[in-house]
Curated annotation (Swiss-Prot):
PANTHER family: ADENYLATE CYCLASE, TERMINAL-DIFFERENTIATION SPECIFIC, ADENYLATE CYCLASE, TERMINAL-DIFFERENTIATION SPECIFIC-RELATED. Could act as a receptor for an unknown ligand. Residues 933-1087 form the Guanylate cyclase domain. Residues 1-34, 913-1380 are cytoplasmic. Its main location: membrane. Keywords: ATP-binding, cAMP biosynthesis, Glycoprotein, Lyase, Magnesium, Membrane, Metal-binding, Nucleotide-binding, Receptor, Transmembrane, Transmembrane helix. It comes from Leishmania donovani. This is Receptor-type adenylate cyclase A. It catalyses: ATP = 3',5'-cyclic AMP + diphosphate. The gene is RAC-A.
């Protein structure tokens, strides 16, 4: 019996019930040898019955032998094994080491002197040899030892039970009647981890760490990858290295490959070995992974805790509460409200106080460091309390709790008298359909052995040797483990393992909370709360809803949204949203805006409630029913509040089109800003439709309706839901005559109707009232949100995976969706082939049976309906002509109109004849042989300013015109024309033009605009561009108030100047002069690339000044710049009219032809019209563009773009991707213009070549030494042309160096001596794709059939246009004109 008193490997004394008593008994026997004879005599003198009874009692109390195999041979896991054994011993101690019938429990421990501790099979067999009546084995510890034990035939044949082994891999969790697992399988822990990653964290980038060559992580990794793949997620990035006892450092190459993906979650699934410790240290300290969630299994929870606490104490990391998690099969020891935990605490307290075997003391190092918890040699006076120990050592305490649960189960089995007779009866008892309840609320089982199929069918547990059926997730907070709320996973008690139970996946529903709109915030928060309550998981194929919200501001909405969807999974966007937000292909369900908007015609946008178009259609179709309540006329007065100019146009078009469909008068439309009041805008004799409510409107409606008894007010459904509480509170105290004349629309059952008839007709209404029984919550917004939840629930049940694209597809595949008897749809999107051609339907809205109802009916459901609900057809017809007039009336009306028209025409003709010659043309340059300096101006972001500040822009534009016209007169220049807010001005001298341009800037700066709103608007525009353009630095938005006031004020005007010969023509219609040709084009395009407040002059205008004039002008040389349609770089000079002003880089070629106000999603037509007026396109090109537009007009815009692609490819015209800020219509027209220019250019070139070849009879080949008009002097051909990107520095030409424009002028002067051109074709490429001009030369092809065999076409780096230029030989004899 010596092995009962040897020290254990874990650092504790060998102890255990009968072992200590046996040692004391052995000493007494040695001392009693002298008394043997006396004892024999005493026995003989006793009676025989007493002797027989004593012998029987001793036999009944024969010890029950249990082997403790819960030990570790590695120093870094000694603490774990020790803690597990301490928990087990705690259970035995509190049962006084007694089995059934009072038999003592004797714990046997391995003998290090006799046993090879590394060979678990040898340890078991040696112990069995020493004690043949050994009943069972506790353990072993770790997967490798369990596998080794089960692989030994002698161990298996011995009939010994291996009870409560501590393992962490699924590979060893197989059926065997020799092992009895008392913890849930590792796969259950993994499933709770995956549920948290997929549903709560929604992380897109997951990493998985495992060590190969161990019984650990293989099956778990396969499950993780399969699950992520089935959910259409990216597979986990791996860190896998072979297990090694010597090479324990981190594999840097493997770690870098993982860390460079910036994982959001790292799953660590390995045994507690040294490699894991080093890996965790690297993960927690590397900047690429330090912010990631680290999730581990319960087996290495203590190791993770130790590494984290050690690094935190050393200052290597900062606290990361909430980012370190671990799965578990039992609650943390800090958990409250659990009966079994209270029992554990009571037994642990008794064990600490009385056993003498608890060797953890408060004056030990409180940090849980491996191998440092052995008892001190000197006796310690104070002991831990249970709570102190739990707080100081949460991970060790949790392992003790696991050991205690297993020990308590073993204790319960040993208390069965008929089980512990021998090993066979013990095994039979263990597998006899057992379920164990510990502490009153912790359940293990059901365990069962082999059984008949019928028994299994009737509910028996068969071939089941494991009992845990649930797991939870714990999180490290303030150096303690807490339960993550709602993080449990469990599977049915009737199942032995979790293989048939999959994780519950969540549908991620995102609500955007716009911080600038409280009503949208309320709607988003309400939806966020309603969805989980209204979503029935049981009806959704293992799915639940995960409702999340994102707080955003308008300026940064796109940036925050893009970050959200790139890092986290989003399946549905529901409710509040921004109209300008680009959501890509994410499914948008029932979007809600700050005020009603027209339907977004995109496939991924789905509307469940009535759209604005549907409501307008229903109103006009039921206008007779509305008029039955009052004597109001059929006129409608519409107030649009808070809408942009473009939105007003679009909504007005729908209003007029719908009114015309029903032959009703067009409505009057009034527009006001969001802050304006309705006072004075509502008509006392019309149907008033208010679109765009704000707080306080309810009281205004009530007062207005009370004052005028023959009017009504109509509000839209979305605003009814947002302002319902205010409307209800205001109108509930009004007379019914007032209540009856406030109208709205709804496709919902009446939410306040709680009658049995209504609930029988509408099951959704009963479901709604069950969730919200309080009548105060019976609102349209809550009912809408319940329907949204039901729609998602039904939609998810029809899909294989709840992924955003599949959900969108499911809407149109199913057509209609019914939830609790409420049908939404029919949804349809696409075309079907018919005998008459394709029939296309694009219907992404599903509201039907739309009713016009009053607030009176909302408050009192017994009020009858105004009219029966209807589903609008949304078919529009042209207004029908009225035939109410008699023929005589019509004839009289026609005659009157004719006479009036004649008189009007005569009057207008006379006025024009008298007044047209009044234009003063004295200042106009009229000599076509003299150079003219043309100056173009334009206001930056004018359209955006009109949309934002319509009340201010009229006066601002008038002031702008006055300033410029005064200066034009002052400098003796000539106003050629104005288009919108743009001027074209002609000057005889370049100095007058330059002085005029500079003084325009200074005058506008000093002008008293009377408001700072214009400057605030420009700041907002620049800040908006920061969010949409990479590397954009706002030039003025971040200036201090003093700096800004000195440099900027009011409208910002850009000016472009160019000097040259022009074609001057007198216009008989306008009685003025106009200027045509390259000079006009160059000046207009120079203005187009400038920024607001900037004056840019070409080198032609600059060098037209005298030396003294140039010396007196502050300027900055900007270097050669590319202009649209100009086949060479043009030297530019910035005139510093206001010293200190800083401008953004010159606008790129594509910016110059796109709308000016891209930051605000508006478009400027003035600049485009001005460019067209100065022959941006040649006459042939314009004609070709007109033909193309006419040919493609019958197709929808998207189809036009597709049909244009082959033509663009054939003609070598590039098609840049469309920006989201450019409409499809503008984009399509731009492509047609490009194609027209190319066709006209090539056609004209061919015509010239044909004529010249006919005259000369030959074609001169290109010279390899031809000048490159796009390169500066001295540049080699290999250098190529590198277009300046936005923001890149500009440099001027070297002193004395001639620019390409001068080379071009010299080149054109040689035209009379030329015979044949050398043709070079510069095809379109993006700047980022440029390498060098040498590379471009490799892609050479002939321009046309007239080219000689040695002529070649080369690619250059033009940013946006494809141009054809002439390359000139250094031999003047071969110089020719360039053509485009």
């Amino acid at each position: 019996m010596a092995m009962q008193i040897r020290p254990s490997l874990g650092g504790c004394l060998r102890h255990g019930g009968a072992g200590d008593h046996a040692a004391r008994r052995l000493s007494r026997l040695r001392a009693a040898k002298v008394f043997v004879p006396t004892a024999v005599v005493c026995v003989l003198l006793c009676c025989a019955p007493w002797v027989m009874a004593e012998i029987t009692n001793d036999a009944e109390r024969e010890p029950v032998y249990i082997l403790n195999a819960m030990y570790s041979t590695e120093a870094y896991t000694n603490e774990d094994a020790k803690a597990l054994w301490t928990g087990m011993d705690m259970a035995f101690y509190n049962s006084h080491y007694k089995a059934a019938g009072g038999r003592p429990i004797k714990i046997l421990h391995p003998d290090p002197d006799q046993d090879n501790l590394y060979d678990i099979a040898e340890v078991i067999l040696h112990s069995l040899a020493r004690q043949e009546k050994l009943l069972a084995v506790l353990g072993p510890y770790l997967d490798g030892r369990l596998t080794a034990a089960l692989s030994n035939a002698d161990v298996v044949q011995s009939g010994l039970m291996l009870i409560a082994p501590f393992t962490g891999s699924s590979g060893v969790r197989t059926w065997s009647d020799s092992v009895y697992f008392t913890r849930a399988e590792p796969m259950v822990e993994l499933k709770v981890v995956l549920m948290h990653i997929v549903n709560r964290l929604r992380a897109r980038r997951v990493a998985f760490m495992r060590l190969t060559g161990m019984h650990f992580g293989g099956e778990e990794l396969t499950y993780v990858q399969d699950t992520l793949t089935s959910l259409l997620r990216d597979p986990a990035v791996l860190y896998t290295v072979p297990y090694s006892e010597s090479s324990v450092e981190v594999d840097e190459e493997a770690f870098d490959a993982m860390a460079d993906t910036n994982p959001q979650v790292i799953i660590v699934w390995a045994a507690p070995v040294q490699q894991v410790i080093y890996f965790l240290e690297k993960v927690l300290t590397d900047p690429r992974t330090s912010s990631a969630y680290v999730i581990s299994c319960s087996m290495i929870q203590r190791v993770v805790f130790d590494v984290y606490k050690r690094l935190l104490s050393a200052g290597s990391i900062k606290p990361q509460d909430g980012r370190i998690l671990a799965s578990a099969t039992t609650s943390p020891v800090s958990g409250e409200g659990l009966k079994y935990m209270e029992v554990l605490k009571a037994q642990m307290s008794n064990y600490i106080e009385n056993s003498g075997s608890f060797d953890y003391y408060p004056d030990d190092d409180s940090t849980e460091t491996l191998g440092r918890k052995a008892r001190s040699e000197a006796p310690l006076s104070r002991k831990y309390t249970v709570d102190e120990f739990f707080q100081a050592h949460p991970s060790i305490a949790k392992l003790m709790a696991l050991g205690w649960l297993s020990g308590t189960l073993v204790q319960q089995t040993l208390e069965q008298t008929d089980w512990i007779v021998n090993r066979s009866t013990y095994k039979a008892g263990l597998f006899n359909q057992n379920r164990f309840v510990i502490g009153g609320d912790y359940v293990l089982g059901d365990y069962g052995g082999p059984c008949e199929p019928l028994a299994q069918f009737l509910g028996a547990s068969c071939y089941c040797n494991q009992g845990g059926h649930s797991s939870i997730l714990t999180v490290l907070q303030n150096a303690s483990w807490d339960i993550v709320p709602d993080s449990s996973f469990k599977y049915p008690q009737s199942e032995c393992n979790s293989s048939k139970s999959q994780i519950v996946k969540a549908v991620s529903v995102l609500a955007l909370l716009n911080q600038g709109y409280p009503k949208l915030i309320d709607a988003g928060m309400q939806l966020n709360e309603v969805l989980p309550h209204a979503f029935d998981d049981n009806l959704c194929k293992g799915y639940k809803v995960s409702s999340i919200f994102l707080r955003v501001e308008t300026a940064k909405a796109q940036q925050l949204f893009d970050a959200e969807v790139s890092n986290y999974s989003v399946d549905i966007i529901a409710g509040p949203i921004f109209q300008a937000l680009d959501v890509g292909e994410i499914f948008v369900l029932n979007p809600l805006y700050n005020h009603p908007q027209l339907r977004t015609e995109k496939r991924n946008y789905v509307y469940l409630m009535p759209t604005l178009e549907q409501q307008i259609y229903v109103m006009y179709s039921k206008i007779d029913a509305l008029r039955t309540r009052t004597d109001v006329f059929e006129d409608t007065a519409v107030v649009l509040r808070g809408y942009s100019a473009q939105e007003v146009v679009e909504i007005s078009e729908i209003l007029f089109k719908t009114a015309g469909t029903f032959n009703l008068p067009d409505p009057s439309v009034a527009t006001i800003s969001f802050t304006d009041s309705l006072r004075g805008l509502l008509s006392p004799r019309a149907i008033n439709v208010v679109i765009g409510m704000k707080d306080g409107d309810s009281a205004h409606f009530a007062n207005f309706l009370a004052k005028y008894t023959d009017v009504m007010v109509v509000v839209c459904f979305d605003e009814l839901t947002m302002y319902y509480e205010e409307l209800r509170a205001t109108f509930s105290v009004q007379p019914t005559s007032v209540q009856a004349r406030l109208m709205s629309f709804s496709s919902l059952p009446l939410w306040t109707d709680a009658s049995a008839e209504a609930k029988a007709r509408w099951p959704i209404l009963g479901h709604f009232h069950k969730i919200f029984p309080d009548p105060i919550n019976h609102t349209p917004s809550l009912l809408r949100d319940v329907i949204i939840a039901g729609f998602i629930q039904e939609l998810v049940s029809t899909t294989t995976v709840a992924e955003t694209k599949l959900l969108t597809n499911a809407v149109y595949i199913n057509g209609g969706v019914t939830t609790y008897g409420f049908t939404l749809g029919n949804f349809e999107w696409g075309c079907t082939a018919t005998t008459s051609g394709d029939s296309c339907v694009y219907k992404n809205y599903g509201a039907s049976n739309i009713e016009i109802l009053s607030i009176q009916r909302m408050l009192d459901p017994t009020v009858p309906q105004l009219s029966s609900p209807s589903t609008p057809t949304m078919e529009y017809r042209p207004r029908q002509r009225s035939h109410a007039l008699t023929p005589a009336q019509r004839n009289g009306l026609i005659a009157g109109c004719v006479v009036g028209a004649v008189v009007l025409i005569a009057t207008c003709t006379l006025l024009l004849y008298c007044c047209m010659d009044n234009r003063n043309n004295d200042a106009a340059p009229k000599d076509g042989d003299e150079p003219v300096t043309l100056l173009f101006t334009d206001i930056e972001s004018s359209t955006a300013l009109w949309a934002a500040l319509p009340q201010l822009m009229s006066d601002a534009i008038a002031a702008h015109h006055r300033v410029i016209r005064q200066l034009v007169k002052k400098y003796g220049c000539y106003e050629v024309k104005t288009i919108g807010d743009s001027f074209m001005i002609a000057c005889r001298s370049a100095h007058s033009a330059v002085s005029l341009a500079c003084e325009i800037q200074t005058k506008l700066l000093k002008h008293d605009w009377g408001t700072e709103a214009l400057d605030r608007a420009y700041r907002e525009f620049e800040l908006a561009r920061v969010d949409t353009l990479d590397d954009y630095e706002p030039p003025t938005a971040r200036l201090s108030e003093e700096e800004y006031a000195a440099l900027w004020c009011g409208l910002r005007v850009r000016v472009g100047i160019h000097t040259g010969l022009t074609d001057i023509r007198y216009d008989e219609v306008t009685k003025g002069y106009d200027y045509y040709g390259d000079t006009s084009n160059m000046a207009a395009r120079t203005e187009a690339v400038a920024n607001g407040g900037q004056v840019v002059a070409t080198e032609a205008a600059w060098w037209a000044l005298s030396n003294d004039e140039r010396a007196g002008i502050a300027h900055t040389a900007m270097g050669p710049q590319g202009l649209r349609g100009v086949p060479f770089a043009v030297e530019m000079f910035q005139l510093n009219a206001v010293p200190g002003r800083r401008h953004a880089a010159l606008r790129t070629e594509i910016e110059a032809i796109l709308p000016d106000d891209t930051a605000t999603d508006t478009a400027s037509s003035a600049a485009g019209a001005l460019l067209s007026s100065v022959e941006t396109m040649s006459d042939p090109a314009a004609g070709i563009a007109f033909v193309l537009a006419s040919c493609f007009a019958p197709y929808p815009v998207a189809q036009r773009v597709r049909e244009l692609q082959p033509l663009l490819s054939k003609w070598g015209v590039g098609a840049p991707p469309r920006s989201r800020l450019v409409s499809e219509e503008d984009y399509c027209q731009g492509l047609m213009n490009r194609l027209a220019i190319r066709i006209a250019t090539v056609s004209q070139a061919r015509l010239r070549l044909t004529r010249e070849d006919a005259a000369d009879g030959k074609f001169k080949l290109a010279s390899s030494e031809a000048l490159n008009p796009l390169a500066r002097e001295g540049d080699s051909a290999a250098g190529g042309v590198r277009p300046r990107l936005p923001g890149s520095p500009v440099t001027s030409l070297p002193a004395g160096g001639s620019s390409s424009m001068r080379e071009w002028r010299v080149f054109t002067r040689l035209m009379n001596d030329t015979q044949h051109p050398s043709v070079t074709h510069l095809s379109q490429q993006r700047p980022s794709n440029l390498t060098s001009f040498t590379e471009a030369q490799d892609a050479a092809f002939p321009l046309n059939a007239h080219c000689g065999p040695e002529s070649r076409v080369e690619n250059s780096g033009a940013d946006d246009e494809e141009i054809v230029i002439v390359r000139v030989s250094r031999n003047p004899h071969y110089a020719r004109h360039a053509f485009e």
